[in-house]
């Protein structure tokens, strides 16, 4: 008899995901694992996959990014948001670029620092930088 997973034992079928019915969570994609003492294998390949997944999921500045930044600050984290890694959609009465600008100005005013990806020292995928904070908040 072959071994079974817990899910198989209780009768749960394998899950499937599409970008319309799931949430992407990038867990612990930190530079320590790419270049530090805890170096993992196949970093370049996993970064490509993470970047591809992230480009398909996207996010919104006025909800996801601002809420994560605010919560991170409330929990005592030093919050950094990468400006050129954030976008949004237009909402009634506000164009997308204006919404991003206002949401990030609110972050800068009270909850954290907004930087450009070019300001990050070392080799890192800038868009993933923001998602490190999400992982810490979960």
Curated annotation (Swiss-Prot):
It comes from the Eukaryota. Keywords: Hydrolase. GO terms for molecular function: hydrolase activity. Pathway: Secondary metabolite biosynthesis; Alkaloid biosynthesis; Mycotoxin biosynthesis. The keyword Hydrolase applies. Its EC number is 3.-.-.-. It catalyses: [(1'E)-5'-(3',3'-dimethyloxiran-2'-yl)-3'-hydroxy-3'-methylpent-1'-en-1'-yl]-quinolinone B = yaequinolone C. It is an enzyme of class 3 (hydrolase). Belongs to the isochorismatase family. Isochorismatase-like protein; part of the gene cluster that mediates the biosynthesis of the aspoquinolone mycotoxins. Within the pathway, asqB converts [(1'E)-5'-(3',3'-dimethyloxiran-2'-yl)-3'-hydroxy-3'-methylpent-1'-en-1'-yl]-quinolinone B into yaequinolone C. The first step of the pathway is catalyzed by the nonribosomal peptide synthetase asqK that condenses anthranilic acid and O-methyl-L-tyrosine to produce 4'-methoxycyclopeptin. 4'-methoxycyclopeptin is then converted to 4'-methoxydehydrocyclopeptin by the ketoglutarate-dependent dioxygenase asqJ. This is Isochorismatase-like protein asqB.
């Amino acid at each position: 008899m072959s071994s079974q997973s817990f899910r198989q034992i209780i009768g749960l079928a394998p899950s499937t995901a599409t970008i319309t019915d799931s949430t992407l969570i990038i867990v612990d994609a930190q530079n320590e694992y790419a270049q530090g003492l805890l170096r993992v294998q196949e970093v370049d390949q996993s970064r490509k996959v993470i970047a591809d997944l992230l480009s398909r999921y996207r996010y919104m500045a006025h909800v996801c990014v601002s809420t994560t930044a605010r919560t991170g600050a409330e929990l005592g984290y030093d919050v950094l948001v990468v400006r050129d890694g954030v976008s949004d959609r237009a909402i009634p009465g506000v164009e997308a670029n204006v919404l991003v600008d206002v949401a990030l100005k609110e972050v800068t005013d009270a909850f954290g620092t907004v930087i450009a990806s070019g300001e990050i020292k070392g080799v890192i995928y800038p868009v993933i930088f923001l998602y490190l904070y999400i992982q810490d908040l979960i």
